Curated annotation (Swiss-Prot):
<dbReference type="GO" id="GO:0006782">
    <property type="term" value="P:protoporphyrinogen IX biosynthetic process"/>
</dbReference>
<protein>
    <recommendedName>
        <fullName>Porphobilinogen deaminase</fullName>
        <ecNumber>2.5.1.61</ecNumber>
    </recommendedName>
</protein>
<comment type="pathway">
    <text>Porphyrin-containing compound metabolism; protoporphyrin-IX biosynthesis; coproporphyrinogen-III from 5-aminolevulinate: step 2/4.</text>
</comment>
<comment type="function">
    <text>Tetrapolymerization of the monopyrrole PBG into the hydroxymethylbilane pre-uroporphyrinogen in several discrete steps.</text>
</comment>
<dbReference type="InterPro" id="IPR036803">
    <property type="entry name" value="Porphobilinogen_deaminase_C_sf"/>
</dbReference>
<dbReference type="Pfam" id="PF01379">
    <property type="entry name" value="Porphobil_deam"/>
</dbReference>
<dbReference type="Pfam" id="PF03900">
    <property type="entry name" value="Porphobil_deamC"/>
</dbReference>
<dbReference type="GO" id="GO:0006783">
    <property type="term" value="P:heme biosynthetic process"/>
</dbReference>
<comment type="subunit">
    <text>Monomer.</text>
</comment>
<comment type="similarity">
    <text>Belongs to the HMBS family.</text>
</comment>
<keyword id="KW-0627">Porphyrin biosynthesis</keyword>
<dbReference type="GO" id="GO:0005737">
    <property type="term" value="C:cytoplasm"/>
</dbReference>
<dbReference type="InterPro" id="IPR022419">
    <property type="entry name" value="Porphobilin_deaminase_cofac_BS"/>
</dbReference>
<feature type="modified residue" description="S-(dipyrrolylmethanemethyl)cysteine">
    <location>
        <position position="240"/>
    </location>
</feature>
<dbReference type="InterPro" id="IPR022417">
    <property type="entry name" value="Porphobilin_deaminase_N"/>
</dbReference>
<dbReference type="InterPro" id="IPR000860">
    <property type="entry name" value="HemC"/>
</dbReference>
<dbReference type="InterPro" id="IPR022418">
    <property type="entry name" value="Porphobilinogen_deaminase_C"/>
</dbReference>
Amino acid sequence: MTTLRIATRKSPLALWQSEHVATALRQHHPGLEVVLVPMSTRGDEVLDRSLAAIGGKGLFLKELELAMLRGEADCAVHSLKDVPMELDAPFVLPAILERGDPADALVSNLYATLQALPLGARVGTSSLRRQAQLRAARPDLELIDLRGNVNTRLAKLDNGGYDAIVLACAGLQRLGLEARITARLDAPEWLPAPAQGAVAVECRGDDARIHDLLAVLDAGRTRACVEAERAMNRALHGSCHVPVAAFARWEGEDLFLQGMVGSASDGRLIHAEAHGSPDATEDLGRLVADGLFEKGAAQLLAEL
């Protein structure tokens, strides 16, 4: 094979991530031609409703997966936080690249920190996870849905529709917009979405040649962390419909996983954490999920 076709969404961030993967593949496989196949997805097109209302983040994948099934693309690049906990057959993730910045960012043109926002300030985010943590920190805030790509969201802030918005640090950094980060929202006080900051490459599991071409990009330490986070989310039956957060980091030879379930309506947060082996990420994820259930997560999730 001399050409590899990467299906990608058309947003600037998706194109950056896909070109990042393409560049890495060219370096590992001299002589391989890598081309992008930009596509529009329903998740990109429907911006007047929340993702939960129109079917969840899996909408960002379906068109790209169909392109692979039709033979129009060999693989697809995704933000791993947008990838469902269970992939449909025959798809697999042969490569999870080294993780970028997992933190969230408060972006404001007027106020330096979350606590500096005035009483009743208007904050834009459609993420239930972010809404839950905002409600816990500042119950007075007016939280307003905000959809669209990074540049669209920044434009809405700059046009005066919001006092602040919350975005992912990694997205801003990848687009050369790190200067727009007003304040970092960091673990352990503020937890990101499972796998936030990680880029994954998806392909058909029955295509060994493509799988092997992509697998050279896999970052084992990142994979261990995000697999633990996603295992916790899976054990909670979580998706983008529920406010679930998780963050794993290496401590010596072990992983330390923090998890959270929250309520976007009243800011109640439940936390749990545990250490575990990087060779047993599924067990670690279930252990933290069990800790959340013991503290009442099932009741909180049932209220959603």
